[in-house]
Curated annotation (Swiss-Prot):
EC number annotated for this UniProt entry: 4.3.2.10
Active site: 11, 130
Pathway the protein takes part in: Amino-acid biosynthesis; L-histidine biosynthesis; L-histidine from 5-phospho-alpha-D-ribose 1-diphosphate: step 5/9
Pfam families hit by this protein: His_biosynth (PF00977)
Subcellular location as annotated: Cytoplasm
Native source organism of the sequence: Staphylococcus epidermidis (strain ATCC 35984 / DSM 28319 / BCRC 17069 / CCUG 31568 / BM 3577 / RP62A)
Xref: CDD domains: HisF
Keyword field contains Amino-acid biosynthesis: yes
Primary subcellular site in the record, as a coarse category: cytoplasm
Protein family: Belongs to the HisA/HisF family.
Highest taxon listed in the record's lineage: Bacteria
Protein name: Imidazole glycerol phosphate synthase subunit HisF
Amino acid sequence: MIKKRVIPCLDVKDGRVVKGIQFQSLRDIGNPVDLALYYNEAGADELVFLDISKTEAGHDLMIEVIEATAKQLFIPLTVGGGIQNLDDITQLLNHGADKISLNSSALKHPELIRQASEKFGRQCICIAIDSFYDKDREDYFCTTHGGKKLTDVSVYDWVQEVEHLGAGELLITSMHHDGMKQGFDIEHLAKIKQLVNIPIIASGGGGNAQHFVELFQQTDVSAGLAASILHDQETTVAEIKDKMREGGILVR
């Protein structure tokens, strides 16, 4: 049985870690390098850096932050946000990223997934999906540009397409759960898992350690992402893992 992962997520804007609720009302959390090293020591299985400054305003890729972090990190580092082409991916991997997360650029140019997978290996390519539930259409649709632009692309169709194109992993953020701390979107995640064979990282809604237990007991996703509850020290990676063990879930 595969051990489940707990992954802190650091949203970085203009060189600082920020966090909001449902992608809005961002507040400053701290220095990304310091926080990354803290989570490395605290037992995190991986780290995700999402450069939302790049997504919003076209800021340069945060190479210096990634390089400084990777030099001292002993766990895998995934980097996403504003990655447009193979050159961007090459630069990030060369400066310390272990995996790359593609979102808007993959929706705009799906062939980028295949090209990146063939060049770097599918294990390096994670497709991030900011999933929005449209009440009128009663279905989930992909968004782009940091959740600001709604598309007509069905999440359930897109996850199957990206797996076919060569994605090695999915990062699914349920936007209406993001920052709400009321639990993961279990039904949505379970349905996605039925459609694909690649690992899924669940994001959006983890408000306490028990929510991670419920996530792994009720779905077959591979990992749970956490941000505000860790940044605000409402719980720790160790406490989440202890609760998971109590629930009979294998952890690293």
